[in-house]
């Protein structure tokens, strides 16, 4: 049997009955939304609903939370925080994801997001870029709505959003 997949017979779930309220000392620094996202990712990818995730489920759950992890890192996390059976329970997952989320650099994350919009690598988000992202996200926004979004945040009035304008929009209020 490979250590990458769950065995047929599983240990009982190690979650307390009130696991939705279980927190670590660091998780108090997370927003309710962030804690909810961690719980939702775990529950979504714990496909057999036994309170434990294997290698593949851990990798996909971490990716869903915005962490693109390599095989070696996932294996290390399972070895250090999982059980002898190679499975990880919710409390360990919550602890790891809390640390990772709190260690994020918001400006770095926003620069990566900007690059997703700027797929033609012009250094600016154009109406065309915004239209593509809206379509990929399944948003049905009209041309006028998309243009209004650009106009509202286009500080230098060049018809596009550059990185500085994007950061100003996204970091407003922090």
Curated annotation (Swiss-Prot):
This is Calmodulin-like protein 1. Signal peptide: none annotated. PROSITE patterns: EF_HAND_1, EF_HAND_2. The keyword Metal-binding applies. Residues 1-11 have a biased composition (Basic residues). The breast cancer drug toremifene modulates the ability of CML1 to activate calcineurin (CNA1). It comes from the Eukaryota. The gene is CML1. Keywords: Calcium, Metal-binding, Repeat. InterPro entries: CALM/Myosin/TropC-like, EF-hand-dom_pair, EF_Hand_1_Ca_BS, EF_hand_dom. Residues 33-68, 105-140, 141-174 form the EF-hand domain. Disruption phenotype: Resistance to the estrogen receptor-modulating drug toremifene. One of its GO terms (cellular component) is myosin II complex. The lineage of its organism: Eukaryota, Fungi, Dikarya, Basidiomycota, Agaricomycotina.
